[in-house]
Amino acid sequence: MTNIIKSFITRNTYLNKLSPSPYQFNKYYSNSISTPPTHSYEKKQQPIQNVDDKKYILTDRFNRHHTYLRISLTERCNLRCKYCMPEEGVMLSQADKILTTDEIIRLSKLFVSAGVNKIRFTGGEPLVRKDVEPLIEEVGKIKGLQKIGITTNGILLSRKLDRLHKAGVNLLNISLDTLNSDKFTLITRRLGWDRVFQSIDNALKLDNIKVKVNCVIMKGLNDMEICDFVEMTRDKSVEIRFIEYMPFDGNLWSDKKFLSYTDMIKIIHEKYPTFKKYTIEEEEPNNTSKTYHVPGFKGKVGFITSMSEHFCSSCNRLRITADGNLKVCLFGNTEVNLRDRIRDGASDQQLLEIINAAVLKKKASHAGMYEIAQNKNRPMILIGEKSKIQINFKNKSIKQKKEVKNYLLKLINSSFINSNNNNNNNNNNNNNSKLQYIQQRNYSTNKNNQNLENNEFSHITKDGKLPTMVDISDKIITKRTAHAQSILEFPSNVLSQLLNLEKNNDIDNDNNISKNKEIVSKKGPVFATSIVAGTMAVKNTSNLIPFCHPIPIESCKIEITIIDSTSVKVDCIVSMSGKTGVEMEALTGATITSLTIYDMCKALSKDIVIKETKLISKFGGKSSSPQITK
């Protein structure tokens, strides 16, 4: 390893002559968005002369020393958050394309040997990976690694928390965008708010672990809860981090939804006038968050200002995607394939040379937020020899093939590969020779690119005369999930009678009805009976709907919630592994559950209305739509 380090020092001595890039505001910054305050500052990094020699391997052209590595363990997630998951779904990598446990451990050791002292595991949702606990236990044994973090949505955290803590996890970021359980379901398209909040409370009980709650603020959706989150810091030693809404392909980003951190601070100051910023000396080095607090409160409040005031000049982080690509900038379009180099038998020295070459191509800062928002399906570009361009044209339409061809021609002639800068020409050629392949991959499916030739009624023959069942014999088996919902409206006095409120004390101090309380009619328990009926209906959907295939249901979850004194919500989520979707099963379950509620309660009133039944989401198969209704 000593020889490797010396070779990098020799090749990179020119770094001492470079000064850090000046901080520049986004030229696309809109006048309609509040300008960051003039007293903002750049966080200082350790001078390059005082950094240990090995860190030259992970030092870029702007004197930034990368000591923080984020590793994605999986592309999968058990939530479908609107700001993260495109409406039309994502194309997951095949299982054999995902980094194995041994590969992740090897890369972790390699980066730590080159100066990384902090590793954070992300996803997708990292805790859905089956071997996450033993994997982190092995990483925790690496000498020189000081901090291990996890970013999680908290759904599965409570049952894994103790083992992860013992394995060395001392940094925990939990995503929670609302303190309202119904709004949580709206944002994530899934249930589980109570489990997330329980995970936060359980984590705060542990010693030697920092807990942060990440909250993405979207104007008109959860900005009215900002002060409620700040109030959490009164009695909890937690850091609430408000994240500016960032544009990623498919998340319908709009400046109308964007709220800058300066606007958030104004909102907080109205309720907490003493709210103030920590001094530079109190801040952690390379901290991405601008940290504030209310004097006397136990916790902190941070702002991650990636859009309105970026922190690129102090960036010290690198990322490895779940399928093994090194990404030097979150918003960059380029990724370098480490997985294939490992599987081709590359030595540690060869991998370090590739990593160093990629780091040296890191730009001074990412693009402006409007430019980022306009980048659709940003491709993965693995830079290398032109003769090794690899594109899979199988099953692509003629239009797509032309687009890819034009894209590659433009790429090959671009300055990104053939630099005309005489000062750095030798260095660029040296770096490029160490990077392999060029390929294009979409991060998500795109409605504009879908083949429209198959927009036909699948249950009618092409001549339009005879109904028919769809042939699914050639389809592949995938995980299928569908979520349907029904809303029932009751006359104002009916639910009160059924709940028998005065006897059962089901009114809280705010005169709110208990949302998960069972109601009882003369026929018996209404909700329990209706859930049984809905479950039976799900299993018999093919007997009710003529062209539904008989399928083995693996999971059926029906939840009935009292929204207010006149409304009841039915959620039916159905899952299975098969060749066809389960949306009809979910809709049937929600419908029959609602009809049974009506039947159980009709003696009190015939004016109960099944207001609507709709499909909320479906996932799996070619036409995945994590959000159907808006």
Curated annotation (Swiss-Prot):
Catalytic residues as annotated in Swiss-Prot or TrEMBL: 599 (for molybdenum cofactor biosynthesis protein c activity)
Cofactor: [4Fe-4S] cluster
Location of region: Molybdenum cofactor biosynthesis protein C: 402-629
Top-level EC class as recorded in UniProt: lyase
One GO term of the biological process aspect: Mo-molybdopterin cofactor biosynthetic process
Molecular function, one GO term: cyclic pyranopterin monophosphate synthase activity
Family: In the C-terminal section; belongs to the MoaC family. In the N-terminal section; belongs to the radical SAM superfamily. MoaA family.
Protein name: Molybdenum cofactor biosynthesis protein 1
Organism: Dictyostelium discoideum
